[in-house]
């Protein structure tokens, strides 16, 4: 049964990366958030600034995993994957989520949160979520959760609310 207060949730970059790149033990919980969100007609949101991080970090993950070597075939494959995987990750996010713009107003409001939380990028996520009418931000960032406990939830908390 869906928690009525969870109809619009913004996914932090770390949760999206966990899902897309199947990162460690966080991937299963991120996948559960996506599945339960879809099953319960929850609108999943993504801040536009997360897209550039997803593109960069997914390409970096490929390059880190597959180091250049003497094999022409392996080097071609590495180059091919590092150029294609980021685009596919962005496509997947766009299929799953509504993209929320980050504009000058978002930046100004994020700047005003610096006494509460010193990470400007995180503050952009918080403000983008608020401006889009999101009920919460789903994140694995413990510090962000501790600074915005009323607004930030772990993937496990969202799964519990949506089951």
Range-by-range predicted roles:
Residues 1-49, 57-67, 132, 146, ...:
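Short, well-structured N-terminal submotif of metal-dependent ribonuclease cores
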Residues 31-117, 149:
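PIN-domain endoribonuclease scaffold, especially VapC-family toxins
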Residues 11, 46, 102, 139-140, ...:
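A conserved hydrophobic position in a structured secondary element of the catalytic/binding core
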Residues 12-14, 53, 122, 141:
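Acidic active-site catalytic centers that drive phospho-/nucleotidyl reactions
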Residues 13, 48, 104, 122-126:
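Conserved glycosyltransferase catalytic-site signature
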Residues 28, 108, 126-127:
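A broad detector of short, well-ordered amphipathic alpha-helices
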Residues 1-4, 126-163:
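Acidic, PIN/NYN-like endoribonuclease modules and their adjacent C-terminal/linker elements
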């Amino acid at each position: 049964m869906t928690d009525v207060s969870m109809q619009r949730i913004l996914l932090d970059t770390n949760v999206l990366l966990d899902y897309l790149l199947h990162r460690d033990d966080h991937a299963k919980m991120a996948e559960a958030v996506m599945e339960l969100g879809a099953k319960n007609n929850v609108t999943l949101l993504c801040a536009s600034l997360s897209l550039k991080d997803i593109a960069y970090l997914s390409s970096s993950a490929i390059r880190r995993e597959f180091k250049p070597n003497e094999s022409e075939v392996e080097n071609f494959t590495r180059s091919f994957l590092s150029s294609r995987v980021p685009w596919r990750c962005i496509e997947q996010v766009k299929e799953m989520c509504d993209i929320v713009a980050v504009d000058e107003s978002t930046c100004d409001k994020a700047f005003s949160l610096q006494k509460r939380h010193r990470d400007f990028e995180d503050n952009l996520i918080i403000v983008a979520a608020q401006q889009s009418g999101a009920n919460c931000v789903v994140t694995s960032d413990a510090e962000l959760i501790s600074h915005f406990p009323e607004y930030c939830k772990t993937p496990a908390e969202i799964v519990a609310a949506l089951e």
